[in-house]
């Protein structure tokens, strides 16, 4: 998936109020960007990092510029816009770039399901196959090439795992899909040191038939695509 129009470059001054970030452009202008990420963004928002941002043509937006990528001072590319995780996953499924999720004839988004009134990110369907429920999570937390999720305690994420376990118990296919959006990550694990309950539930989910997949995106200032399966250790 290519960025169109092309992203523009700036240097991060600070992120604040969760949804805002101040940057300085190469020609010395200071801009305030919308930050589409409510998480901790650990390691993704260090002052001095290069920021790649898009610009909306919607004149009614108070902040027309959106922070899309960070290029860390070590050179790693990180997608901080969490909306891209679902977009890239959908593109990869439709292109059959994810072998484990190929061979389905129908893809539906945001389908209501479960006893806790959830919406599944994607449902895949095909004749003579169980429905496949896919919950997508964006992974950007990295420590020494190890990717982790979540970067903060997530009761919502815990709920999704419970829902997926129920789906698997009903004989349908249940998948938790970790979209790794950090170019330095080479392997994935749940962040037990941040959310022990989530890590416990993920292990329980696997034992109860929920499939765990992690795929890494190739990221540059020109575009992104999910390409490579990564090893998962619970």
Curated annotation (Swiss-Prot):
Protein family (similarity comment): Belongs to the SfsA family.
Identification of the protein by name: Sugar fermentation stimulation protein A
Role noted for this protein: Binds to DNA non-specifically. Could be a regulatory factor involved in maltose metabolism.
DNA-binding region residue numbers: 201-220
Annotated keywords: DNA-binding
CDD domains in the record: SfsA-like_bacterial
Gene assigned in the entry: sfsA
Pfam families: SfsA (PF03749), SfsA_N (PF17746)
Cited NCBIfam families: sfsA
Source species of the chain: Shigella flexneri serotype 5b (strain 8401)
């Amino acid at each position: 998936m290519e960025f169109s129009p092309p992203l523009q470059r700036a240097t991060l001054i600070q992120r604040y109020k969760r949804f805002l970030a101040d940057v300085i452009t190469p020609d010395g202008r200071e801009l305030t960007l919308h930050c589409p990420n409510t998480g901790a963004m650990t390691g993704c928002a260090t002052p001095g990092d290069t920021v790649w941002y898009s610009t909306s043509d919607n004149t009614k937006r108070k902040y027309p510029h959106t922070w899309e990528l960070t290029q860390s001072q070590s050179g790693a590319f990180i997608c901080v816009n969490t909306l891209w995780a679902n977009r890239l996953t959908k593109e990869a499924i439709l292109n059959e770039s994810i072998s484990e999720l190929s061979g389905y004839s129908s893809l539906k988004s945001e389908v209501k399901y479960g006893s806790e009134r959830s919406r599944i990110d994607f449902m895949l369907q095909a004749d003579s196959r169980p429905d496949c429920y896919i919950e997508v999570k964006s992974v950007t937390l990295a420590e020494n090439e190890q990717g982790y999720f979540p970067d903060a305690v997530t009761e919502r994420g815990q709920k999704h795992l419970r829902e997926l376990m129920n789906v698997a118990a009903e004989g349908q296919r249940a998948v938790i899909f970790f979209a790794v959006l950090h170019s330095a990550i080479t392997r994935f694990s749940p962040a037990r040191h941040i959310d022990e309950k989530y890590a416990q539930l993920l292990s329980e989910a696997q034992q109860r038939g929920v499939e765990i997949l992690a795929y890494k995106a190739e990221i540059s200032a020109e575009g992104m695509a999910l390409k490579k399966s990564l090893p998962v250790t619970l």
